Amino acid sequence: MLWLALGPFRAMENQVLVIRIKIPNSGAVDWTVHSGPQLLFRDVLDVIGQVLPEATTTAFEYEDEDGDRITVRSDEEMKAMLSYYYSTVMEQQVNGQLIEPLQIFPRACKPPGERNIHGLKVNTRAGPSQHTSPVVSDSLPSNSLKKSSAELRKILANGQMNEQDIRYRDTLGHGNGGTVYKAYHVPSGKILAVKVILLDITLELQKQIMSELEILYKCDSSYIIGFYGAFFVENRISICTEFMDGGSLDVYRKIPEHVLGRIAVAVVKGLTYLWSLKILHRDVKPSNMLVNTSGQVKLCDFGVSTQLVNSIAKTYVGTNAYMAPERISGEQYGIHSDVWSLGISFMELALGRFPYPQIQKNQGSLMPLQLLQCIVDEDSPVLPLGEFSEPFVHFITQCMRKQPKERPAPEELMGHPFIVQFNDGNATVVSMWVCRALEERRSQQGPP
């Protein structure tokens, strides 16, 4: 059996190993190891001890190809586990599959108490048997777990995401101020989306933007896109986020109301979450609403960084067609301005066209200010009642009131009959619609 183990071990000598330590009832912690084949049983127990300091752990388990749990209590059993895992990784690489972390399950552990261990990352570059300490790893943070502010500083200081670890694949789209790519993160084996924005700003402003982006690590909502990190290379900022295989809503045609209702619920919940953190989105529009084939709906590109918002505005001159009248007029911006943008976005998604026919959005949503003056001067557009339900028409009408204070507050949005009607957790409706739309798009494009 020894010669069988040598092949995978030698092949994986320079490969980063990510061990996912499963915590009972509390999620998981990822541990990145740069000397995987030399890893000893005691090394793993030491790290488990850091993750679960209140428990006594003498062994751990992993799952084989049949899903059976195999116990590891010694270096010999540790080598057998690594050999099995590396063989699996080599098969995944040959088949072009994504590499999954090695999952282990600590044994004889008491559940951890209320401690701030969520999102802990451990990174060891040391040789075997050397004790490790919790520092930031190269693996992607789990966007379902919150991070402490101390860890955030480590993440940004250690450059968790960097260009050398990213392989760009396809161009997903060109937004206002940047290009979005589908990319592969080598250390973790994850697919992600990377938005690259060219900015003519000073090094000091770059540092301020990175500091402001820290709050994205604290976002813990299933309706907000997962944020993995950001970095500057010269005058380009790259923002790395979760990849959504359905893309943004601006590329879809007219959306049926029963689908749009479920999407609206998710968007309102996402906005309400941001507002609870005192974050204004500032750029609510269909291209910043993402969907996937699982039926999830998530918001992206919200204005957590004032400096980034201002820098993009200075670099890319124009006015957003989804802006509320008070923003176009240069007045104060608030939650109610986001609500207007919510209303005009869903009106467009329902109609299949921009609600103001005199405004042509063929060249994107940025345009000269004078073209948008009609939004300030004219009455708000209204949906035809015979074509849509009364609750939906009322929802849009309320969101698009010209006076900001007359628009619904966050709690009023969640309690609106249109939102209540579709707040049933039925992701299957959105999933089926996304899958069908993607299939139609592929059939129209024909074979490559």
UniProtKB/Swiss-Prot annotation:
Enzyme Commission number: 2.7.12.2
Modified residues (Phosphoserine): 311
Catalytic reaction annotation: L-seryl-[protein] + ATP = O-phospho-L-seryl-[protein] + ADP + H(+); L-threonyl-[protein] + ATP = O-phospho-L-threonyl-[protein] + ADP + H(+); L-tyrosyl-[protein] + ATP = O-phospho-L-tyrosyl-[protein] + ADP + H(+)
Active site: residue positions: 283 (proton acceptor)
Pfam name, any one: Pkinase
Binding site for ATP: 172-180, 195
Residues with the Phosphothreonine modification: 315
UniProt record, GO biological process: cellular response to growth factor stimulus; ERK5 cascade; heart development; insulin-like growth factor receptor signaling pathway; MAPK cascade; negative regulation of canonical NF-kappaB signal transduction; negative regulation of cell migration involved in sprouting angiogenesis; negative regulation of chemokine (C-X-C motif) ligand 2 production
Region (Disordered): 116-144
Subunit structure: Interacts with PARD6A, MAP3K3 and MAPK7. Forms a complex with SQSTM1 and PRKCZ or PRKCI.
Protein name: Dual specificity mitogen-activated protein kinase kinase 5
Lineage per the UniProt record: Eukaryota, Metazoa, Chordata, Craniata, Vertebrata
Gene that this polypeptide is encoded by: Map2k5
